[in-house]
């Protein structure tokens, strides 16, 4: 129990803090953002293996890169499609970067079929070829998925494989744990980023992760 003097001192401190916050309301969103960043970092650290370990060949760049950039994407997401050349530029500009792709099919039934096909491609060592071919083929449909698979030399036998079902479920669960609210979502270091971002912002996050 606090003595009378200690209680009075605590009350004075609380009043100073209260008055400061009232006079500087801009610190509230800053404090909330800092708390959110801390919580995000803890969530990433707790799930890093599931986040950064690629499924088959669903990765690009330097396999021994010192920083891993992870993209959670949906094949029916226009912003994900628009990010494709940016990722290629990042890899060209940063020889120490590894990129891991994680299917997060949340937008449509076609998204889910496309995700299964891309994971089959990853199992067969042909992820990037399928990934590029499907994005180049216009809106996602059964026909465009088949065309991309044919172009990449991917067999679509095994779309309902339990291993692929488990991989998609794991990605969904991880996205919930990380409070992701859409695609594309990015993880680099301990940071979670959302949306179609300029390459400079991604590079800034990569540099921060590298400096840790």
Identify the meaning behind each predicted range.
Residues 1-107, 163-182, 204, 211-212:
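Extracytoplasmic thiol/disulfide redox context detector
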Residues 105-212:
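Cysteine-centric redox/oxidoreductase cores and disulfide-bonded domains
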């Amino acid at each position: 129990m606090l003595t009378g003097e200690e209680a009075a001192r605590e009350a004075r401190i609380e009043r100073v803090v209260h008055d400061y916050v009232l006079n500087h309301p801009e610190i509230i969103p800053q404090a909330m953002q800092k708390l959110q960043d801390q919580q995000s970092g803890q969530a990433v650290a707790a799930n890093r293996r599931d986040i950064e370990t690629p499924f088959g060949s669903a990765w690009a760049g330097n396999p021994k890169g010192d920083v891993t950039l992870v993209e959670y994407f949906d094949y029916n997401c226009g912003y994900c499609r628009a990010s494709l050349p940016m990722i290629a530029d990042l890899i060209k500009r940063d020889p120490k970067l590894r990129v891991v792709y994680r299917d997060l099919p949340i937008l449509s039934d076609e998204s889910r079929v496309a995700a299964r096909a891309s994971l089959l491609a990853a199992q067969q060592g042909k992820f990037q070829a399928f990934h590029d071919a499907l994005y180049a083929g216009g809106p996602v449909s059964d026909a465009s998925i088949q065309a991309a698979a044919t172009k990449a030399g991917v067999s679509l036998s095994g779309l309902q494989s339990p291993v692929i079902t488990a991989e998609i479920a794991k990605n969904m669960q991880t996205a919930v744990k990380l409070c992701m609210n859409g695609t594309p979502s990015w993880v680099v270091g301990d940071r979670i980023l959302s949306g179609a971002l300029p390459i400079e912002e991604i590079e800034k996050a990569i540099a921060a992760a590298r400096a840790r």
